[in-house]
Amino acid sequence: MGSRALLLLKVALPLKHQIKCLNYTKITPASELLTKRRFSIKATNGSSLQPPDVSRLAETARISLNQNEVEEFAPKIRQVIDWFGQLQAVDLNSVEPAIRADSEGENLRDDVPETFSEREAIIAAVPSYEKPYVKVPKVLNKE
């Protein structure tokens, strides 16, 4: 049983570039299924999202900014908005939806029943025991 990791390499690209498409290529070495992502880069004019008014944004966040700070933060906020625009441009049609991020593959151990030799010690350690059940506090907030 092995673990999976995603290695991301940061490439210095101008802000006007965005990911055009994202494809998956399956590689099967030693009966393990690995996923390799390939993407192509395409120059664009930036995000279709409109950058917010920094003064109004600061007021909404209940922070005070002077005019110099507004001028300093405006390009940085536009850059973040452009990054969100790049995310919107990613083609996800070739990606199968997943319920959880780790739902691909089987990462569970074998379900093998075990017999505990110190049963009485375990029962003595729990706060509430009603034969044959161990009572635990309510976990879900169902009423």
From Swiss-Prot:
EC nos: 6.3.5.-
GO MF terms held by the record: ATP binding; glutaminyl-tRNA synthase (glutamine-hydrolyzing) activity
Top-rank taxon: Eukaryota
UniProtKB keywords: ATP-binding, Chloroplast, Ligase, Mitochondrion, Nucleotide-binding, Plastid, Protein biosynthesis
Subcellular location: Mitochondrion; Plastid, Chloroplast
GO cellular component, one term: glutamyl-tRNA(Gln) amidotransferase complex
Note: This protein may be expected to contain an N-terminal transit peptide but none has been predicted.
The protein's name in its UniProt record: Glutamyl-tRNA(Gln) amidotransferase subunit C, chloroplastic/mitochondrial
Encoding gene per record: GATC
